[in-house]
Amino acid sequence: MYKRQYQHRADPNTPAEEVAATIADLMKEGKVQHWGMCEVSAETIHKAHAICPLTAIQSEYHLMHRLVEENGVLDTCRELGIGFVPYSPINRGFLGGCINEYTVFDPNNDNRQTLPRFQPEAMRANTRIVNALQAFGRTRGMTSAQVALGWLLQKAPWIVPIPGTTKLAHLEENLRTLEFSLSPEEWRELEDTVAAIPVVGDRYNAEQQKQVGR
């Protein structure tokens, strides 16, 4: 089976260099064209890229979670010419204003129920951030989801967010983000506003956190 882009999280039991060498072999065999890694550290990116050049790195990145700006991941991608793919750019729907402390998640297929940041008390507190995005967007004709996506899109041309949705209306709303053009000063205003609001709740529980940032 041919894969145009092979992307995965790091195996905690296998050195990055070994994984990269295996991918290089698969490329030589014509089974993989490009590859990337998900939720890895800057150190791991350097190690893997030295063996088999990476095309993309995927990590969670949005206005409520900006760790990749601080831990060297974005700097490493910029330095090595690797694309960066923010997943959950609307924070699993939260920044779109569609869910709140009263939302009941399906226990069978929605892992948000297990995440500390999606517990009722955390969502209640973090609604202040959604309100800030809505206020910012209201004066510019944008929804809060479009504000969240637009903020990412203006960061760099090699940063390409991948919002997921099961609804056509949300897909169309997301695409309309491309119609807006704001100044750097406006985006800095938004960043400053959101940064002044404490984020309540961790992204993952302790066990899940062990699987990221390696």
Give the label of every model feature segment:
Residues 1-2:
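Short, small-residue-biased leader/transition segments that mark boundaries at the very start
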Residues 10-193, 197, 207-214:
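Beta/alpha (TIM)-barrel catalytic core signal, keyed to glycine-rich beta->alpha loops juxtaposed to Asp/Glu
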